[in-house]
């Protein structure tokens, strides 16, 4: 603050044209000072600033290149994932369709096998019934025959006496003898 006060004190004592003094025109002074400072900065700082800007530019370009490479890699991975997803979806649809076809085929096979089993079971049942019927009929015939034979034997035993028995034997011997004689003639 003291320097500022001294500056204003010297304003009153402006030296003549050939001497060194204080320029009181603030705008002109700042402009000259700024020009000198900027000139010095440009002269000395130009290389440093250029190197800093070049390094910054190289880092930015390198970051952009890396980002582009990452973007390309990500796009490639995304495309591969999409292709893989499409393949998986197609396989899933194929498995689904094959599964439905296989289920329908197995269902038809099961129905056919069940139908065949039922037909065979029906045939076996009918055969069993037929054989049981035949067996029952044979048993009935056998009982009827046995009863008829027993009845006939009972009737014959009650009707036959010894004399009738001898006559029947002689008649049968005569029939057998005549059959034997005819046979010898032929």
UniProtKB/Swiss-Prot annotation:
UniProt keyword terms in alphabetical order: ATP synthesis, CF(0), Chloroplast, Hydrogen ion transport, Ion transport, Membrane, Plastid, Thylakoid, Transmembrane, Transmembrane helix, Transport
Cellular component per GO, a single term: proton-transporting ATP synthase complex
Subcellular localization: Plastid, Chloroplast thylakoid membrane
Annotated membrane topology: Single-pass membrane protein
CDD domains: ATP-synt_Fo_b (cd06503)
Main subcellular location: plastid
Disulfide bonds: none
Pfam families the record matches: ATP-synt_B
Molecular-function GO term, any one: proton-transporting ATP synthase activity, rotational mechanism
Transmembrane segments: 27-49
Domain of life: Eukaryota
Keyword rRNA processing attributed: no
UniProt-listed InterPro entries: ATP_synth_b/b'su_bac/chlpt
Family note: Belongs to the ATPase B chain family.
Job of this protein: F(1)F(0) ATP synthase produces ATP from ADP in the presence of a proton or sodium gradient. F-type ATPases consist of two structural domains, F(1) containing the extramembraneous catalytic core and F(0) containing the membrane proton channel, linked together by a central stalk and a peripheral stalk. During catalysis, ATP synthesis in the catalytic domain of F(1) is coupled via a rotary mechanism of the central stalk subunits to proton translocation.
Description of how the protein assembles with itself and partners: F-type ATPases have 2 components, F(1) - the catalytic core - and F(0) - the membrane proton channel. F(1) has five subunits: alpha(3), beta(3), gamma(1), delta(1), epsilon(1). F(0) has four main subunits: a(1), b(1), b'(1) and c(10-14). The alpha and beta chains form an alternating ring which encloses part of the gamma chain. F(1) is attached to F(0) by a central stalk formed by the gamma and epsilon chains, while a peripheral stalk is formed by the delta, b and b' chains.
Note from the entry: In plastids the F-type ATPase is also known as CF(1)CF(0).
Protein name stated in the entry: ATP synthase subunit b, chloroplastic
Gene (UniProt): atpF
